[in-house]
Amino acid sequence: MLDTNIALFVAASLAVIFAPGPDNIYVLTRGVAQGREVALASAWGMCSGLLLHTTLAAVGLSAILARSAVAFSVIKYAGAVYLFYLGVRALLSEDEFVSPEEEPPRARLRSFFFRGLTMNLLNPKVAVFFLAFLPQFAVPNEATTGAAALRFLALGLIFALLSLAVFSAIALSASILGDRLSRNPRFANALRWLTGCVLVGLGVRLALSGRQ
């Protein structure tokens, strides 16, 4: 029963992760525009955010977002503003984009890690999703609250690891495409505009979205 439950969870998780959304689209655009290292750093940041969301859900804090329209809206609009800021910054700053052949400095990679982390944490729909999704695969009549929380964390860890694997594959594939396109200056400039517009669009989409 447990093995079947985990198998179903993995299958359902992969279906969710592969579905187009802000996280995988962000990794895709970073990989195309700025190369493998930047995209991977962004992916690690986002998956770290998933672990934090799991922890918050396990201790019950995410339930506040599910119940409070005010708390949900505050975080949602903060996330939308942050995405909009990243998009405008990409559109205005040519320094944001370097050739994928150049190795980004470590400080730059840390910056993109924290951008990915912040972007994920400021999306309240992730927290609400975890509250709705993970309990479906919990063991009924768990012996203790502590055991239930540990299982919640284990499922969240599996989801984060699956996300990291998928996002890493997207980052590597996108960086190969970006490396070829960036050799043409016109394509490189188009990639900058594409990334900026995608981020602004994701911000607008988040701002206009509901809880579902």
Label each region the model flagged.
Residues A7, A11, R106-T118, L150-L157, ...:
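Alpha-helical membrane-protein architecture signal
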Residues R67-E96, A160-I170, G178-Q212:
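Selective transmembrane alpha-helices of multi-pass membrane proteins
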Residues P22-I25, F84, V128-L131, L164, ...:
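Residues that mark transmembrane-helix kinks and helix-interface sites
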Residues L2-S73, A132-A160, G178:
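Juxtamembrane transmembrane-helix termini in multi-pass membrane transport proteins
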Residues E37-F112, S173, V204:
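Membrane helix-loop-helix hairpins that form the core translocation module of multi-pass transporters
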Residues L14-I17, N120-L121, A160-S168:
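Residue-level hotspots within the lipid-embedded alpha helices of multi-pass solute transporters
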Residues L122-A127:
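Selected transmembrane alpha-helices and immediately adjacent juxtamembrane segments
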